[in-house]
């Protein structure tokens, strides 16, 4: 923010961070488009099945993934009343530093638990709520959302590849919701529109770097461990 000259350019705390996550969201769509496409198709098939009173057996993996994402998103609504207070913590370097250390510890420990086998077919609905709670807690500045949710998945016995995939797909409704809320503030005249070019640069860089990081993380997960 300091480099691009947009620090404090908005009365809405965290607006620039939200825009950066929008770039990462684009990267998620590109990296996981086959899975997301299947989920979209199954969403409409599910509506059709509901209208006709039918239920496929077994439930298609993509349809179950939709349910896991919905349940994993619910805990975010619990923290909405304190959203502004949490965003205000970004100015406290002690909080951010401690949160970064916690993220590192979570990733270190999670990489040393027994490798799990759960995927979208076998993960429990309660697992989705727990990972969703981890995502809600990761709204604290300094806590990595993806790192925290991936670690939570590993603790719950998720297959490493599924933990990564679920973490990033779970981010879609969260980031979309955050951007809708921030857009409302922007339309209210709280954004310095002269900084829009800097915002665009930030989003583009976040998209490119985000995609590269997702690809790298997928490759690392393929070997079954995140560490050496």
Segments predicted by a language model, with ranges:
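Multi-pass membrane proteins that catalyze or facilitate reactions on polyprenyl-/lipid-phosphate substrates
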Residues: 1-228
């Amino acid at each position: 923010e300091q480099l691009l000259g947009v620090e404090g350019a908005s009365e809405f705390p965290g607006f620039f961070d939200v825009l950066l996550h929008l770039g990462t969201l684009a990267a998620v769509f590109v990296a996981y488009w086959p899975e997301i496409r299947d989920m979209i198709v199954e969403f409409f098939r599910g509506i059709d099945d509901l209208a006709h009173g039918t239920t496929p057996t077994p439930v298609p993996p993509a349809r179950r993934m939709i349910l896991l994402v919905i349940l994993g998103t619910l805990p975010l609504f619990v923290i909405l009343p304190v959203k502004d207070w949490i965003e205000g913590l970004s100015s406290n370097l002690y909080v951010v530093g401690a949160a970064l250390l916690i993220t590192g510890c979570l990733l270190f420990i999670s990489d040393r638990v027994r490798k799990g086998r759960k995927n979208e077919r076998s993960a429990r609905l309660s697992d989705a709520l727990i990972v969703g709670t981890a995502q809600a807690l990761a709204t604290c500045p300094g806590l990595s959302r993806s790192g925290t949710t991936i670690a939570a998945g590993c603790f719950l016995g998720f297959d490493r590849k599924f933990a990564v995939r679920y973490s990033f797909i779970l981010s879609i409704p969260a980031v979309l919701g955050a951007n809708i809320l921030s857009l409302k503030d922007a339309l209210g005249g709280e954004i310095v529109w002269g900084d829009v070019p800097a915002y665009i640069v930030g989003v583009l860089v976040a998209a490119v770097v985000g995609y590269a990081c997702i690809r790298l993380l997928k490759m690392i997960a393929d070997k079954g461990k995140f560490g050496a």
